[in-house]
Amino acid sequence: MPTHEIRHPLVRHKIGLMRRAEISTKSFRELAQEVGALLTYEASKDFNLGTEVVQGWAGPVEVEKLKGKKVTVVPILRAGLGMLDGVLSLIPAAKVSVVGQVRNEETLEAKTYLEKLVGELDQRLALIIDPMLATGGSMISTIDLLKKAGCSEIRALVLVAAPEGIAAVEKAHPDVHIYTAAIDERLNEKGYILPGLGDAGDRIFGTKQKS
């Protein structure tokens, strides 16, 4: 199954803290980074390793090192930026591609307004990051862009996912694995996840949430 709900106790605890209405912007932002790092740990478990001999303190020693495709992290603006530092804390050499998506609040369809992708995507593994996987429109559109640019290995990291969004992404891109900290109940009539986290972008950046 291409969707992985991470049940680690630390992940469950931190997502529980993020659900609280009274949590501060500072704490929400820090937790988004921390859960982003934990999701990265899970999503990278099958990365290839090679060996090399280095000079250690007591002489030559064989060590392991990452081997294979380089990584590009792809935050979906703006909320995806809230997870970026957490991902880069584990993969600091990764290059960052940026995709801006805006959702039509009436049709719930996603529209791309910004696309800044790194080069040689055919030789890179892409980690798309976005706190919320709701309808799946923004995620599908971003995956479409990456595949069109030549990227063939793509993984999605989200804090909370709705069943509707998971189904949409799996139908459109069955080869893309989704790593999520929680699978929630459903979407409401406005396309927001219930119980969800609220508007993740507003909660990360401290801007006013829509009623």
UniProtKB/Swiss-Prot annotation:
Keywords: Allosteric enzyme, Glycosyltransferase, GTP-binding, Magnesium, Nucleotide-binding, Transferase. Its cofactor is Mg(2+). GO terms for biological process: UMP salvage; uracil salvage. Transmembrane segments: none annotated. 5-phospho-alpha-D-ribose 1-diphosphate binds at R78, R103, D130, P131, M132, L133, A134, T135, G136, G137, S138, D199. InterPro entries: PRibTrfase_dom, PRTase-like, Upp_B, UPRTase/APRTase, Ura_phspho_trans. It catalyses: UMP + diphosphate = 5-phospho-alpha-D-ribose 1-diphosphate + uracil. Signal peptide: none annotated. Pathway: Pyrimidine metabolism; UMP biosynthesis via salvage pathway; UMP from uracil: step 1/1. Its EC number is 2.4.2.9. HAMAP family: Upp_B. Catalyzes the conversion of uracil and 5-phospho-alpha-D-ribose 1-diphosphate (PRPP) to UMP and diphosphate. This is Uracil phosphoribosyltransferase. It comes from Hahella chejuensis (strain KCTC 2396). The gene is upp.
